[in-house]
Amino acid sequence: MDGIINAKYQDVAEWVPSDGALPAGTVVVLNRLKTNAVAPSAIAYDTAVAGVVSDQPGVLLGVAGDNKAKIATTGRVKVHVDARTHAVNIGDLLVTSDLPGTAMLSEPLDLGGVKIHRPGTIIGKALEPLPSGQGEILVLLSLQ
């Protein structure tokens, strides 16, 4: 392939084996019991974070099949977010929460006056605010 791809939607996703149907916006982690598969996240700050279930990816890789989900790993995608404890503002870093399939604000660690976010846990940056409660916001995915 050569040239520019013009896509209506804004993320890149791949068909990945999963445990049944997963709703769009669900944060997923590597399935620790199955090779090359994902499952909804359920642990806060999980370093096995793998992406977010996409509704309509701009670019979709792989082959569809039973028990597969479209997992976005880059681009902009709607994500289930929990802001019951801390408000989420534009630009905030998001991580997995203990609420299944849901992201939350990343609270940095203070290491001798230097604040750092836990490596390997970041899902992406909030592109929309969520002042309180639970909801779905647009996130710029940048797994790290």
Q: Which role fits each region the language model picked out?
A:
Residues M1-Q144:
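Extracellular receptor-binding modules and their adjoining Ser/Thr/Gly/Asp/Asn-rich linkers
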